[in-house]
Amino acid sequence: MLEYISSLPKQPISEEEKEGLIEMREEEKLARDVYLTLYNKWKLQIFKNIAESEQTHMDAVKYLLEKYNIPDPVKNDSIGVFSNPKFEELYKKLVEKGDKSEVDALKVGATIEDLDIADLEKWINKTDNEDIKFVYENLMKGSRNHMRAFVRMLNNYGSNYTPQYISKEEYEEIISSSTERGMNR
């Protein structure tokens, strides 16, 4: 993916596009950090696998930050450490909830992907840069796949998930559709 992104032109970037990249870098880190923490607690393979995917999402956004000479908000890559206090608070809240049971942990995973999808949709609508849109669209495919995986696991536990950030209709469409592949260009 990085090879393709590097082939796209560097376009003028707005303050809003910069803000989106900074926010998504830390939001992808939030996902990775929560999943690693929950993996250490529950040893459910899904958390380890998706944390690895979140690392590639972080790397793709970092590549764009470097491409556009935007300072990386991830100054300290330690788990649970964020530049933006909102992500530090969210990390603590989500880990506390996920610490209660395996089902709660899986619901936390679905919640993170729910938030990710909503935020990516917001930022996609605020950018016209081809490379940024491409990365966001691929991150969104990943988030939809992750949501499907968490919901499948919840169903295996006899539980389910109610969306908090995206519409019920969008959620139903996501979980009833097939796994998506990245890099469609």
Swiss-Prot record:
Classification via Pfam families: DUF2202
InterPro entries per UniProt: DUF2202, Ferritin-like, Ferritin-like_SF
Xref: Gene3D superfamilies: 1.20.1260.10
Stated name of the protein: Uncharacterized protein MJ0754
Gene source species: Methanocaldococcus jannaschii (strain ATCC 43067 / DSM 2661 / JAL-1 / JCM 10045 / NBRC 100440)
